[in-house]
C-alpha cells in the first residue's frame, strides 16, 4: 500500500520522516516535500494525491503523529470504491455543526476523489481562505479537512475509523476543545 505524507516548510524536521519510515517500513511511503503548485500552501498539498492515476486505495497522513499499539490496523482498514475513510475528529477547532473528521488521515481511491482535486484547483486561493473567512477555523493556514469533508459528502460515502483508536495529548484542555 502507498502512504503519502506532507512535510513542507521547516515546522517539522527530518526526524519526523525518519520516525514514520521506521514505523511504516512494511508500506511504500511517499513524501510530498514541495508544493505541487506555487499557490498551494502547506497541508493543502495533500490534494495532490487526489489527482494521481492510481486505481487502488492509498493513505494520506499528517507527519506529526505518534503510532502506538496495533497501529497497522489503521492502514489496513478496508475501504471500498466510492468510500473515503477518515480519522474521527476527537478535538474541534470549530463551533460549526456537521463536521466529524480530523484531516490527519485519509484512505481512498484517488480516481474516486479526482473531482475534489479539480474543484480545489478551480479556486485554490478561494478554498484556502473559505473556511477561515467563514469562521469555521482559524488562519493563517487551515481548513483542508473541512474542504475534503464537504467535498466527499457530495459524491462519496464518508467512513470513520473507530473513535477509540485515537487520542491527542495536549498541555491544556482548551487546546483540545477549541
Q: What are these model-predicted stretches?
A:
Residues 24-28, 53-57, 80-83, 153-157:
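Short glycine/proline-enriched coil/turn segments at helix->beta-strand junctions
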Residues 18, 44, 48, 142-150:
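A structural signal for well-ordered alpha-helical segments within the folded catalytic domains
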Residues 109-178:
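Catalytic core and acceptor-binding pocket of nucleotide-sugar-dependent glycosyltransferases
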Amino acid at each position: 500500500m502507498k502512504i503519502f505524507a506532507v512535510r513542507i516548510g521547516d515546522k517539522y524536521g527530518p526526524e519526523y520522516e525518519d520516525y514514520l519510515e521506521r514505523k511504516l517500513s512494511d508500506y511504500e511511503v511517499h513524501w510530498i516535500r514541495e508544493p505541487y503548485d506555487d499557490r498551494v500552501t502547506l497541508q493543502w498539498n495533500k490534494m495532490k494525491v487526489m489527482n494521481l492515476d492510481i486505481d487502488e486505495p492509498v493513505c494520506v497522513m499528517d507527519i506529526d503523529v505518534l503510532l502506538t499499539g496495533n497501529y497497522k490496523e489503521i492502514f489496513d482498514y478496508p475501504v471500498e470504491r466510492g468510500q473515503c475513510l477518515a480519522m474521527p475528529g476527537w478535538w474541534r477547532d470549530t463551533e460549526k455543526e456537521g463536521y466529524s473528521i480530523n484531516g490527519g488521515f485519509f484512505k481512498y481511491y484517488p480516481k474516486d476523489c479526482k473531482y475534489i482535486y479539480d474543484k480545489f484547483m478551480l479556486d485554490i486561493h478561494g478554498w484556502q481562505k473559505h473556511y477561515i473567512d467563514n469562521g469555521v477555523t482559524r488562519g493563517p493556514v487551515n481548513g483542508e479537512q473541512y474542504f475534503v469533508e464537504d467535498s466527499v459528502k457530495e459524491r462519496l460515502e464518508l467512513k470513520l475509523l473507530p473513535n477509540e483508536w485515537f487520542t491527542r495529548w495536549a498541555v491544556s484542555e482548551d487546546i483540545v476543545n477549541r
